[in-house]
Structures are given as C-alpha cells and as structure tokens.
C-alpha cells in the first residue's frame, strides 16, 4: 500500500477533530467579542510553529500536499505548522523566488535553479549542498513513457535515433526536467564512445522529432496521456504515477541513462526551527520512505529497494559532464548555448 494513500487517510482522520476545534474556538472568540483576523492560506494560531511557503518544481506537488506535509504536521515538531504551496516549471519557480515570491523551502529539478537564489541576494545560503546528501531531496532516472505494449519497440536512446517516432519532452528553457532529458540523450552518446559533436547531433535529431515541448514535466505528461506523441521522455516517478493512475501507458528504463538529482534548501528568511525541521523530516527514514512509495529513489542508499528501483546497467551523472554550472553555460545559455542554438533554428522559444 502506498504511503501517500495511508498518509491521506491519517490526515483526514486527524483533520476532523481539528476542524471541530477550530469551529469551537471561533464560536468562543465571537462570544467574547474578539476580532476576526482574516488571512489567506491556512495560517496557524499564535502558539503554532509558523507557516511554511513551499515553492517547488511541478512533479512532486501531490507528494508534498497529500503525504509529506500531513505526515510532518502529525509529528511532534510539525505541531502548529501550516503550509502554503506553489508548484510549476522549475526555472519559472526559481525566477519567481528571485523576484520576490515568498518561499521558506525551495525544491527545484536541477541545481542551476538553486544557484540562481544563491547568486541573487543569497536567498539561499552558499552551503546549501554541504550535507551528507549534498542537498538532494530524492533521485530518479530518465525513462521512456510509451503506449501500452510499447508498439514502437523503444528500448534505448539509440532507438530514438533510428526509428521514425514522435517525441514529447518539455521546453528546456522553462523546465528542469527537459534539461535532464536532453543531457540523457547527450550522455548516452558520450558513454557509447561518440564525440561531443556527434552527441550533439543526436540531441538535434531528438529535438527535430519532438512534436510538443510543454512548459513543465507535468504538462508534458498530460500532453502524452491525452494522445500526443509516441514516446515521452520523463522522470521515472512520473511514469510510475501515470501507470498507478490507470493511464494506458507503460515505461522503459533504458540500459544507459542519467540519474536525476533534485535539490532542496531552506531560504534565509524561513521561519525557524520549523523550516529546518521540515527539511530534516524530508531526509528522515519516514520522509524518504514516502518518496519511495511514490516512485522516487531515496537518497539514503540503505532505503533503496533494488527490486523496486533496479540500477541501470550504465547509470551516468550530471557531474560526469562538469556539473550544472558548466552544463548550463555550454548547452543552455540563451545566447551561446549549443542546445539554445538548435532550439532557435527549430523555432522554439528559449526565453524561459
């Protein structure tokens, strides 16, 4: 049974007496002539642990709102803590926080979006990644989501080169997940012994076959399940979610693929200790088990079930290409990036 479903049930059961308590307190306040302090969001009482603004990339929204947050609220350190949530394309979310959107916890799909907040006013501390998990909340891998039965017979990234298929992947200038996808294509070629120029040619071929580039990973999944394309490049967890929700799809883990690492941090103005307590909960065994039961690979190696999450034969990492700082400059810089140049030639927006 999925932990997310268990947590939702616990949350509902716990919420009934809480609702009665709120009602009784409201009646008491009116009876005593107290004033009504209206506010947006869920808020907390004066003795509570504060309100946390979670800003994240699109795909883990349900894990937060239906599992992680309710479970934390039921813990001793989460008592009195409430949440406000904002989820969307990773790059858009990062830019919004840099522009002033309130955020206590930020969770993006790639480290470049986190580094933006370090560089612009140190909204996030420079040492955000200096812990045993290097600031990573959970892992995944790049997979193919295909129609039931895999009618095109897609097994590896090489098949995307040789077969006449319509591909869906998000726009890499708004979506972090798309950058993982593109680097998986590139990395597969490099791992096979091809030159950087040859690898970039394979990226070009994939983008030429791409029939839709939605703004986020979640939007890309929606486009695919609504009938567009033959194959979707996606996070493994999104593929698992689609299968569990009864979509007429299945997924393939290529033998050579890229590990996805999603960074998380507290912001400098986050209410403490609530923000750090929630971050610690996300890294706790309970938090990591919630991620695992929702299709994400735990960062704690002791909690990884090899039957559920078998290690691909050739698993490579973004660090193999110099890390996101180098990768973003070389491939995704709007003015000089090689992928940006390809996208512009194809008439795709690179403005983010």
Predicted segments, located by residue:
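Ligand-binding pocket segment of bilobal, Venus flytrap-like solute-binding proteins
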Residues: 192-255, 263
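N-terminal segment of the mature folded domain
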Residues: 37, 41-174, 314-317
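Extracytoplasmic/periplasmic substrate-recognition and gating elements
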Residues: 247-289
């Amino acid at each position: 049974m999925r932990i997310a479903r268990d947590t939702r049930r616990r949350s509902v059961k716990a919420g009934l007496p809480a609702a009665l308590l709120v009602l009784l307190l409201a009646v008491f306040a009116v009876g005593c002539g107290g004033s009504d302090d209206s506010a947006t969001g869920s808020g907390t009482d004066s003795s509570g642990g504060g309100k946390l603004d979670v800003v994240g990339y699109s795909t883990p929204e349900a894990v937060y709102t239906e599992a992680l947050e309710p479970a934390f609220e039921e813990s001793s350190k989460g008592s009195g803590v409430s949440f406000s949530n904002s989820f969307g394309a990773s790059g858009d979310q990062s830019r919004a926080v840099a522009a002033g959107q309130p955020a206590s916890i930020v969770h993006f799909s790639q480290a470049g979006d986190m580094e933006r907040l370090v560089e612009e006013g140190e909204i996030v501390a420079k040492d955000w990644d200096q812990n045993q998990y290097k600031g990573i909340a959970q892992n995944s891998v790049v997979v193919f989501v295909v129609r039931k039965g895999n009618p095109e017979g897609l097994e590896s990234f090489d098949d995307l080169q040789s077969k006449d298929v319509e591909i869906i992947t998000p726009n890499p200038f708004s979506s972090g997940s798309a950058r993982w996808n593109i680097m998986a294509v590139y990395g597969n070629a490099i791992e096979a012994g091809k030159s950087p120029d040859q690898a970039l040619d394979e990226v070009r071929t994939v983008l030429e076959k791409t029939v839709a580039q939605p703004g986020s990973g979640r939007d890309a999944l929606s486009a695919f399940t609504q009938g567009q394309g033959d194959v979707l490049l996606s996070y493994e967890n999104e593929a698992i979610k689609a299968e569990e929700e009864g979509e007429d799809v299945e997924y393939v883990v290529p033998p050579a693929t890229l590990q996805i690492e999603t960074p998380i941090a507290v912001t400098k103005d986050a209410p403490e200790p609530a923000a750090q307590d929630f971050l610690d909960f996300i890294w706790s065994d309970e938090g990591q088990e919630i991620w695992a039961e929702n299709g994400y690979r735990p960062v704690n190696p002791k909690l990884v079930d090899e039957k559920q999450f078998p290690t691909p034969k050739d698993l490579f990492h973004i660090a193999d290409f110099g890390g996101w700082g180098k990768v973003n400059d070389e491939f995704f810089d709007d003015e000089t990036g090689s992928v940006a140049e390809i996208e512009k030639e194809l008439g795709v927006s690179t403005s983010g």
